[in-house]
Amino acid sequence: EEIVVTGSRIATVDGFGQVAPVSVVSADDIKMTGMTRMEDLLNTLPQVETAQNSFISNGSTGTASVDLRGLGPARTLVLFNGRRLQPGGVNTQIPDINQIPAAIVERVEVLTGGASATYGADAVAGVVNFITRRVNGFEISGGYSAYQHNNGDKYIQGLMDARNFDYPTGDSGFDGEAYNLDLVMGTDFA
C-alpha cells in the first residue's frame, strides 16, 4: 500500500517528525457531501478560504484558489500527488484547483501549520495535497441539483410593498439549476 506523507520531503527515523496539524478528507467524505468541486469541499474546512478570480472581462469564472489562514493564495502551496500544481493561467502563479476532478481524488490532506522550511516561501500558510486514486477502466457519474425561492418572507414582502417595489410572486418554478457529469478513464501502462 502506498503512503504519501505531506509535510516532509526528508526521510526520518520512525517516531521523529514534524508536528503540525493535518486535516484529511477521504473519498468517502467527499461522496457524503455530494460536492463535485474541490473549491466547495475545501470551503467546509476550518482555516481554509477559497476564491474565484477572473482576469477576463467577459465574465469568465477564472481560477479557484486556496488561501490558508487568510495569508493569501500566494502563501499556500497546492500539491497534486506530492508535486506542485502548475499555475492556473498566464496572469497568475496561483494554481487552479478547478483542474482537479473530485471523481479521482482519494483524499485531500491540509497541513495548516507553516511548511516553508520544507517546501519554500510559498508554503508559509500551509500545504494542500490532493492525492488521487489509480483508475483502471471506465467510470461515469452524474448529478443534478436545483433550487427554488418563492419570495415568501413576509417581512421582506412588507418592506417591498411599502416602497411599491415589484417582485415575483407565486410558484415561479426553479430559480437555478446545475448539472454535473464526470467521466474518468484510466489504465496501467506498466
What does each of the following model-derived ranges do?
Residues 11-12, 39, 43-84, 129:
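Extracytoplasmic beta-strand/coil segments of soluble accessory domains associated
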Residues 3-33, 60, 88, 138-141, ...:
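N-terminal periplasmic "start-of-domain" segments of outer-membrane beta-barrel proteins
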Residues 127, 135-186:
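Short strand-turn segments of transmembrane beta-barrel domains in outer membranes
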Residues 58, 86, 114, 144-148:
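Transmembrane beta-strands of outer-membrane beta-barrel pores
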Residues 22, 30, 42, 108-109, ...:
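Non-catalytic regulatory/gating segments with a bias toward low-complexity or hydrophobic composition
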Residues 2, 20-40, 65-71, 94-98, ...:
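Short, polar/charged loop or turn motifs at beta-strand boundaries
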Residues 83-112, 158-159, 173:
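Short acidic/polar hinge/loop motifs at secondary-structure boundaries
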Residues 38-41, 64-66, 96-98, 122-142, ...:
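N-terminal periplasmic accessory domains that precede
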